[in-house]
């Protein structure tokens, strides 16, 4: 009975295919006479003999191993099946698709910033893409000792070094610490190159790295939003005028009744006219080109808190916009 069992042909295939599995090794010790190889779409089959690559087959289909595979192997191409003996070989099935993985910093990383001795705590998140590129390196470094390998294994490796790379490239490419998203493309490009160098020796390549967002502490985000409001209306006086107009429109200012409503409406109209006049004056001044006077120069001390200013366009102490 055991004699006939040894003669049963194998079906060499990756049956339990998973999208998150990078490769799977079929190693049932012997390939019997009459066995078939099944390659499904999105898979490559690599024949191995004693750890050496005998052949790589990339076209999906159903193949007779004796007549359609063995003739194309390297050292085993002359192999003949015996009456009661099979071919000792392993078959590595590789997932050929490009993998997309989400990433995010587990904890905030402190980026050096002016006026912040401990650095600016920042979180970030996004995605990266990778795929298998070199089967020889993959086998030498990973597949030689593992029967299967998952996307999660790669993600763990990437996350372990990502904080250092973010700090490196934010410091190098981040032109404005309060608006890092403006330089997200350059930061991501540098990180992708470094990650690719980490994985290329293992037979994989990083084909893309994207930063979806940078996240600041709430108090810093509030300061950024406040400064954006200042910049949008031009100066503090205009900001106060808009705030007062909004307060009257929402009914939050003191006073009630028809007289109060009428007074509020008249005041709002007057402020709106003043704001329009100021905006028109600014537009005319801008259209006339840059002036040689120092009215648009950066002050030596912050007008809001009095702190001495540096090279940045914002006060290092309170975040006040300086120019």
Swiss-Prot record:
Matching entries from InterPro entries are given as:
Band_7/SPFH_dom_sf, SPFH_YdjI
Signal peptide range in chain numbering: none
Superkingdom of the source species: Bacteria
Pfam families membership: Band_7_1
The family database entries (PANTHER family) matched by this protein are listed as: FLOTILLIN BAND_7_5 DOMAIN PROTEIN (PTHR37826), ZINC-RIBBON DOMAIN-CONTAINING PROTEIN (PTHR37826:SF2)
The name on file for this protein is Uncharacterized protein YdjI
Name the source organism. Bacillus subtilis (strain 168)
């Amino acid at each position: 009975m055991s004699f006939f069992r040894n003669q049963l042909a194998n079906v060499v295939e990756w049956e339990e295919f998973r999208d998150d599995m990078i490769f799977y090794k079929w190693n049932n010790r012997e390939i019997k006479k009459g066995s078939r190889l099944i390659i499904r779409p999105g898979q490559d089959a690599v024949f191995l003999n004693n750890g050496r690559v005998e052949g790589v087959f990339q076209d999906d289909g159903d193949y007779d191993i004796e007549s359609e595979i063995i003739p194309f192997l390297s050292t085993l191409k002359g192999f003949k099946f015996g009456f009661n003996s099979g071919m000792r070989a392993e078959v590595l099935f590789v997932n050929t698709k490009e993998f997309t993985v989400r990433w995010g910093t587990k904890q905030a990383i402190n980026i050096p910033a002016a006026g912040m001795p401990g650095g600016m705590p920042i979180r970030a998140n996004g995605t990266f893409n990778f795929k298998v590129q070199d089967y020889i390196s993959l086998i030498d470094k990973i597949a030689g000792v593992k029967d299967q390998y998952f996307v999660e294994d790669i993600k763990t490796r990437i996350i372990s070094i990502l904080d250092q790379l973010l700090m490196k490239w934010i410091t190098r490419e981040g032109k404005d610490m309060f608006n890092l998203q403006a330089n997200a493309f350059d930061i991501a490009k540098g990180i992708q190159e470094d990650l690719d160098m980490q994985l290329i020796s293992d037979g994989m390549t990083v084909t893309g790295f994207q930063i979806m967002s940078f996240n600041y502490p709430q108090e810093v985000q509030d300061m950024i939003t406040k400064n954006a409001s200042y910049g949008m209306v031009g100066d503090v006086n205009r900001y106060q005028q808009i705030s007062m107009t909004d307060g009257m429109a929402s009914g939050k200012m003191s006073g009630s009744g028809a007289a109060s409503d009428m007074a509020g409406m008249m005041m709002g109209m007057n402020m709106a006219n003043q704001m329009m006049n100021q905006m028109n004056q600014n537009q005319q001044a801008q259209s006339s080109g840059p002036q040689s006077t120092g009215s648009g120069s950066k002050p030596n001390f912050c007008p809001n808190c009095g702190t001495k200013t540096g090279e940045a366009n914002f006060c290092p102490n309170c975040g006040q916009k300086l120019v």
